[in-house]
Amino acid sequence: MGCIKVISVFLAAIAAVDARAFFHNRGGNDVIPNSYIVVMKDGVTAEDFDSHISSVAATHSLNKAKRGSETVGHKDSFNINGWRAYNGHFDEATIESILKDDKVNYVEHDRVVKLAALTTQPNAPTWGLGRVSHKAPGNKDFVYDSSAGQGITIYGVDTGIDIRHPEFAGRIRWGTNTVDNDNTDGNGHGTHTAGTFAGTTYGVAKKANIVAVKVLSAGGSGSTSGVIKGIDWCVTDARSKNALGKAALNLSLGGSFSQASNDAVTRAQEAGIFVAVAAGNDNRDAKNSSPASAPAVCTAASSTIDDQKSSFSNWGTIVDIYAPGSNILSAAPGGGTRTLSGTSMASPHVCGVGAAMLAQGVSVAQACDRLKQIGNAVIRNPGTGTTNRLLYNGSGR
């Protein structure tokens, strides 16, 4: 599980920091060597933060000169609604020094984050839209409020989006890229999820505006710090465009437990962005995955066409709602379509319905609770302690 946060918070809280325990108890094979995320305590000022960064830079330079370390030091700083953190590439001596600073809340190892999609099935039926707009299964028509997310901005934090795809014509722009220098979707995952949350044909919120935020490579992987950097950008962008309270964010990705990842999405939600997250595809308790385990966000598990839990879907008390995730047809780069399965496909259904609710006047703070309230209690064998509620858009059908 690799839950470093518990260890690092404890280490940061005691007077004599046993940094050896931190390095020894890394856990998992997803740790990025010598890469860390440092989170400051609440209340640390901008001046204190800058002073800390300067001190870390000096310490890193000194240690690098002494030991010939090839680490590069501080990389990016984050400020998500007052949550201050940074990531970097440091040797152990520098991390030991960082852990001793009383302004530091915790340090955790940066880890690999991957998309949450599984298989492709050619010519599978398009069933998700009909299912989320009817109380009974088997309906092919999608019934929805005509506002359809109009006036809402949805950030697709993923592998990028094919912004030239006709599904998004006139409603999409490229945002930022935290993983490479290729501002395209070389994987297809991000285009597919965007097609579900806001595509003209395959989407739920058909009139919402879309922003492509690339945090995963064409191979479908990235880092926790790269995802946090993308989320930070989204909050800053929404604030600059007066879109807080009128924005949603889809995260069809995840990794092992990360308190920093959970903190970042929580602050984004608190800032005024509805956040939908994939529960994960390991058929295990989602409490062990991030950012799915963040209580503040709307965590989506995956259902099948016959209202059962998808065999791969994570479950648990942290799951807020089930949504269609098996064999979902949506957009593919180059103007085509593709069928994918995964909680990655469930999350954008939730994101789209959430965005549509925001357009109807439901607040960001109330949106997930509203989805849980009106969801249909139809999922069979949802998993131990897991809701049996299936996503419903309240169409009345």
From Swiss-Prot:
Residues 35-116 form the Inhibitor I9 domain. Residues 20-116 form a propeptide. Its EC number is 3.4.21.-. It is an enzyme of class 3 (hydrolase). Induction: Expression is up-regulated during infection. Coiled coil: none annotated. Keywords: Glycoprotein, Hydrolase, Protease, Secreted, Serine protease, Signal, Virulence, Zymogen. Residues 126-397 form the Peptidase S8 domain. One of its GO terms (biological process) is proteolysis. InterPro entries: PCSK9_ProteinaseK-like, Peptidase_S8/S53_dom, Peptidase_S8/S53_dom_sf, Peptidase_S8_Ser-AS, Peptidase_S8_subtilisin-like, Peptidase_S8_subtilisin-rel, S8pro/Inhibitor_I9, S8pro/Inhibitor_I9_sf. SUPFAM superfamilies: Protease propeptides/inhibitors (SSF54897), Subtilisin-like (SSF52743). Belongs to the peptidase S8 family. Secreted subtilisin-like serine protease with keratinolytic activity that contributes to pathogenicity. PANTHER family: CEREVISIN-RELATED, PEPTIDASE S8. This is Subtilisin-like protease 3. The gene is SUB3.
